[in-house]
Swiss-Prot record:
GO terms for cellular component: large ribosomal subunit. Binds directly to 23S rRNA. The L1 stalk is quite mobile in the ribosome, and is involved in E site tRNA release. Protein L1 is also a translational repressor protein, it controls the translation of the L11 operon by binding to its mRNA. NCBIfam families: rplA_bact. This is Large ribosomal subunit protein uL1. Keywords: Repressor, Ribonucleoprotein, Ribosomal protein, RNA-binding, rRNA-binding, Translation regulation, tRNA-binding. GO terms for biological process: regulation of translation; translation. Part of the 50S ribosomal subunit. SUPFAM superfamilies: Ribosomal protein L1 (SSF56808).
Length: 237
């Protein structure tokens, strides 16, 4: 079946030239083409020269977006003992021990981030079927297996995101809202680019960066000039 493209999207696509845009120009265009009746999310799609079926070519890490995500992040914490009170005091939305594990096993997924203390991981591990496909399984690399619950909860609430390359080597990250200024979106996109460069897998060979596209959630894809993004120096502050 041929997918029907809405007139709104077709009109927006007509405004995007077949070229790689300067980063700020691309983000200005993203904002202009975000015409849905809600505050659309800004998304980046980065194709890397990696083959994640090899362990030394996998990318899974976190980025702290300086300008935040623009959305309220619901954080769940699996812990026990006095750490339950610490998690509650730090502003976690859902906190529990074995009973929370059972709820998740039954399909409760009312959160965007799941943090666990190391002592609970043997029990959390059995939730692989529920958490794995959604990328929600806690991991030390993702900053979601930790004893510092106060710090971790604060960071994820403030705009820290975990991301990974999918099996085709593409990274998909939501890096703000269309209501952000183009300059703030650029600060977040630059932080993402630097994080991807800093965490280049040891087995990555040849050209690492292949393509970068940005879009709003209902808008067309806009190609970004990779060299211009990587060479960009932003003023501090």
């Amino acid at each position: 079946m041929v997918k029907k493209v809405s007139r709104r999207l077709r009109d927006a696509q007509a405004k995007v030239e077949n070229k790689a845009y300067e980063p700020l120009e691309a983000l200005t265009l993203l904002k202009e083409l975000a015409t849905a009746k809600f505050d659309e999310t800004a998304e980046a799609h980065i194709r890397l020269g990696i083959d994640p079926k090899y362990t030394d070519q996998q990318l899974r890490t976190t980025v702290s977006l300086p300008k935040g995500t623009g959305r309220t992040v619901r954080v769940a914490v699996i812990t026990r003992g006095e750490k339950v009170q610490e998690a509650n005091n730090a502003g976690a939305d859902i906190v529990g021990s074995e009973e929370l594990i059972e709820e998740i096993a039954k399909g409760m997924m009312d959160f965007e981030v799941l943090i666990a203390t190391p002592d609970m991981m043997p029990k959390v591990a059995k939730l692989g079927r529920q958490l794995g496909p959604r990328g929600l399984m806690p991991s030390p690399k993702g900053g979601t297996v930790t004893t510092d619950l106060t710090g971790a909860i604060a960071e994820f609430k403030a705009g820290k995101l975990e991301f990974r390359a999918d099996r085709t080597g593409i990274v998909h990250v939501q890096f703000g809202k269309a209501s952000f200024s183009a300059e703030d979106l650029l600060v977040n996109l630059k932080a993402l680019q630097e994080t991807v460069d800093r965490n280049r897998p040891s087995g990555a060979k040849g050209r690492y960066w292949r393509t970068v596209y940005v879009s709003s959630s209902m808008g067309p894809s806009i190609q970004v000039d990779i060299s211009a993004l990587r060479d960009l120096k932003l003023a501090e502050g």
